[in-house]
């Protein structure tokens, strides 16, 4: 009851803030500033409410279809880092789960955690027989009980939001579905048996890639609440300065990252949902460096027809085919069937023309002679026209964003940021080239990652 009272007190405070903001009917820069202030308060509230709400906030940071950009940006800053819990509790969980104490299982076990997150913390250890260094991920105590209370309250909040909150422009929000999806993701993430299986599947997909390293799992020392994996240290991928000092090629690392992610999404249909810098590193003990993936708690599968839709979308963008792009969006479940296709294709045509103009800008002597302000004004005019067309279609609410696609789009955005940090010129679209056209009638495009790389 005490927990529920705390949750509803926080909900009431946030709802009152939203009510006051809407009552002011602010526009332009004032509205953006007010949204940022409200979003910062929301972020602090989620941190106060603890693990469940921190994870919910991280999941909501992918929902560009239902939340303002200012809120998305603030929620994206949510981190897993929280104070660690005492080592004695971790040791007790290990004994309960594995049936033996750490002194029986390991030659050494570091009491001070290597890292602590909202759902678990990680300790370094050494195996007795082989002497191999491992990391032991131990789940926080009573997490499932906390989830049950929190998610029950969140479902009620979602029910109220569906009835009181107006729908977003051009897309329909279903807070109940968002709450249910978030709950499923959370329960799956705290099942370490699921994470172990995901890590093994991911490693199998990349077994021929020498430039990609996935830490191996020790199933005999793992359970639903304990996960033991190979210890593979590395340089954080966002630490460009240290990577340069150690002689690594940022272009090579960026290529490894983009190619590996295209492999996941376009070829295997099994992808890492959270490739942020904390889950990626460069193995500085490997000649030339190799990319290390960590944390396989949030993974998604993609059905073959949806995967093909995504591949077709990429090709239709490069080949400037708006009708095919809309077909691909329908196959992906992003564009609703039966909407005003003429209006949507007109928007797609404008977007693709803008993309093609960007591709051609490097060879466009006239555009290269434009001042920075003229280029900025040209881009602003293109965006304004697209925005007007989108506004005209909002009554149909043609777009929807299935949860797995929000993960894909967020992941590509994260990878784009990492890549630009390593090599600002890597994603310059003026240098991009279209992938080779597949043979006529070919339904699959298995060489896509190579073509886009």
Locations of regions flagged by a protein language model:
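ATP-dependent phospho-/nucleotidyl transfer catalytic cores
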Residues: 69, 76-83, 95, 144, ...
């Amino acid at each position: 009851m005490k927990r529920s009272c705390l949750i509803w007190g926080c909900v009431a405070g946030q709802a009152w803030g939203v009510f006051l903001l809407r009552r002011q009917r602010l526009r332009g820069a004032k509205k953006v500033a007010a949204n940022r202030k409200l979003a910062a308060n929301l972020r602090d509230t989620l941190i106060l409410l603890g693990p469940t709400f921190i994870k919910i906030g991280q999941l909501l940071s992918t929902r560009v279809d239902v939340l303002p950009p200012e809120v998305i940006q603030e929620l994206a800053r949510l981190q897993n880092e929280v104070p660690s819990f005492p080592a004695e509790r971790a040791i007790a969980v290990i004994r309960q789960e594995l049936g033996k104490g750490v002194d029986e299982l390991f030659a050494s076990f570091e009491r001070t955690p290597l890292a602590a997150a909202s759902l678990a913390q990680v300790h370094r250890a050494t195996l007795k027989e082989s002497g191999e260094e491992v990391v032991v991920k131990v789940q926080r105590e009573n997490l499932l009980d906390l989830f049950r209370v929190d998610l029950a309250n969140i479902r009620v909040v979602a029910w109220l939001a569906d009835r009181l909150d107006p729908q977003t422009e051009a897309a329909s929000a279903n807070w109940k579905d968002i709450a249910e999806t978030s709950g499923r993701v959370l329960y799956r993430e705290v099942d370490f048996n699921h994470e172990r299986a995901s890590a093994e599947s991911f490693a199998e997909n990349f077994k021929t890639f020498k430039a990609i390293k996935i830490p191996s799992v020790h199933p005999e020392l793992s359970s639903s609440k304990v996960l033991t994996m190979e210890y593979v240290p590395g340089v954080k991928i966002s630490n460009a300065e240290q990577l340069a000092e150690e002689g690594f090629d940022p272009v090579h690392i960026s290529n490894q990252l983009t190619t590996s992610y295209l492999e996941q999404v376009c070829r295997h249909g099994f992808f890492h949902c959270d490739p942020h810098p904390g889950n990626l590193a460069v193995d500085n003990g490997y000649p030339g460096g190799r990319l290390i993936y960590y944390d396989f708690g949030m993974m998604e599968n993609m059905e073959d027809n949806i995967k093909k839709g995504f591949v077709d979308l990429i090709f239709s963008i490069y080949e400037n085919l708006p009708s095919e792009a809309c077909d691909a969006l329908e196959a992906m479940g992003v564009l609703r069937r039966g909407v005003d296709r003429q209006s949507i294709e007109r928007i797609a045509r404008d977007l693709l023309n803008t993309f093609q103009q960007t591709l051609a800008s490097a060879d466009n002597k006239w555009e290269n002679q434009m001042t920075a302000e003229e280029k900025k004004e040209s881009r602003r005019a293109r965006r304004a026209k697209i925005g007007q067309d989108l506004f005209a279609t909002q009554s149909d609410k043609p777009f929807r964003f299935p949860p797995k696609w929000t993960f894909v789009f967020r992941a590509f955005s994260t990878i784009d940021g990492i890549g630009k940090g390593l090599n600002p010129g890597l994603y310059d679209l003026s240098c991009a080239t279209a992938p080779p056209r597949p043979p006529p009638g070919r339904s699959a495009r298995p060489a896509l990652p190579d073509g886009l790389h």
